[in-house]
Amino acid sequence: MRPCQTLVHAALIVTQDKERRILENASMAVTDGIVADLGPRHEMITCWQPRHEADFGRCLLLPGLVNAHTHSAMTFLRGLADDMPLMDWLNKRIFPVEQKLTPEIVRLGSLMGYAEMLRTGTTACVDMYIFEKEAMAAADQAGLRCLGGEVVFAFPSAAFPGPEAALEETRALAQKYAGHPRLSIAVNPHSVYTTTPEILAACRDLARELALPLHMHLAETAEETQICLHAHGKRPVACCRSLELLDGPCTLAHVVDVTPDELDFLAQRGAVAVHNISSNMKLASGASPVPAMLERGMPVALGTDGAASNNRLNMFTEMGRAALLHKLTGMDPTLLPAQTVLDMATLGGAAAMHDNRLGSLAVGKAADCVALDLAAPNMQPLYNAVSHLVYAATGMENRMTMIAGEIVYEDGKFTRFDYDALCREMTSIRDFVRRQAGLA
């Protein structure tokens, strides 16, 4: 018998491998944070000698979901500003509070965001915020995978006086996390309309120099397009194209107000689009033309955006809403079938992370997985596992979250931090935010 770190048993394993196999009454062997083998349980128990055994015999095991665009720390703003247009929401509520932030608020807000993700089946995220050093430290503490980086604005933030300092912070973070098994860094210009061509060029140059991906908001609303036309005489995608900003690996959040020609360009560049359906619905920003993206072969992922504009960080919510919205707006019930949406939340997310170890459970891939209880009322009876994951599951069926072979959440308990203490800290943060927003 071969030794392994952990042997995980499940009623079903949705592998998301190239054949999209679903294994019944199966087991997965994990060694050094990597999937060593998968197969029928009765065979695996005769082949592998584990140090630990995790029996989720009535559960469905699937690859951990990837939240491909979020601002994890913004849990501290959840419910602060609802039912407002994007620009009013940003300029009247969000940006003023963010100018008063402290590193500790960002650390705690991020940790709460990661707790929500781990609880609901997300194992990795692409994050962007201020004081991102604290967000990355929180991700390390929680055990999550994270592609993060300091957001770059043309104006001062609470963290830095200007874009030059934010880019230097990006450089420092890239050096700090080089070679880290779970954490990596991207260059994060906020958007075309909150930066300048010179700042975007500096972001491009740093990404090229350090071989980092680029992550930004792009073409989120028609209003953004008008702002860019007024300031630069070009639409947002054209601004990026003229600067060769998207010539390297890039993850683009929203991509709503785009033309067919712009989609052709983005597809040719291999850009990854992130569909943030809940946030776009709540802010009435519009919907990404996802079917048109997929027709062009564009990688498409799903993201929650921040809790201030969603208000959840739950990828099961995003899957269900994405599948339903496009059927409605396209007046076609065959658009975005369940398997396509699950692919977006897993394999598309891996593309957004620029990490081919993620997105599926196969030999040699990262042992990042979650276990959903099939005995939950909303999961009964079971005809089609993928259908249930997209249309029936809520994320609250999750019993276990494993990242790099380590169980970081199981049956209501987080293994790496004190959740009750975190809740007490969030109450203090709420009182601070109320005062800053003039709501106390």
Curated annotation (Swiss-Prot):
Q: Which Pfam families match?
A: Amidohydro_1
Q: Which InterPro entries match?
A: Amidohydro-rel, Deaminase_MtaD/DadD, Metal-dep_hydrolase_composite, Metal_Hydrolase, MTA/SAH_deaminase
EC number of the protein: 3.5.4.28, 3.5.4.31
- Family indicated by similarity: Belongs to the metallo-dependent hydrolases superfamily. MTA/SAH deaminase family.
The role this protein plays is:
Catalyzes the deamination of 5-methylthioadenosine and S-adenosyl-L-homocysteine into 5-methylthioinosine and S-inosyl-L-homocysteine, respectively. Is also able to deaminate adenosine.
Q: How is the cofactor bound?
A: Binds 1 zinc ion per subunit.
Q: Which residues bind substrate?
A: E98, H190, E220, D305
Q: Which CDD domains does UniProt cross-reference here?
A: ATZ_TRZ_like
Names of required cofactors? Zn(2+)
The keyword Zinc appears for this protein: yes
Q: Is Metal-binding one of the keywords?
A: yes
Question: Which SUPFAM superfamilies has this protein been placed in?
Answer: Composite domain of metallo-dependent hydrolases, Metallo-dependent hydrolases
**Family annotation (HAMAP family):** MTA_SAH_deamin
The residues the record assigns to binding Zn(2+) are: H69, H71, H217, D305
Query: What are the entry keywords?
Result: Hydrolase, Metal-binding, Zinc
Q: Which reaction does it catalyse?
A: S-adenosyl-L-homocysteine + H2O + H(+) = S-inosyl-L-homocysteine + NH4(+); S-methyl-5'-thioadenosine + H2O + H(+) = S-methyl-5'-thioinosine + NH4(+)
Molecular function terms in GO for this entry?
A: 5'-methylthioadenosine deaminase activity; metal ion binding; S-adenosylhomocysteine deaminase activity
Q: What is this protein called?
A: 5-methylthioadenosine/S-adenosylhomocysteine deaminase
**Entries under Gene3D superfamilies matching the protein:** Metal-dependent hydrolases (3.20.20.140), Urease, subunit C, domain 1 (2.30.40.10)
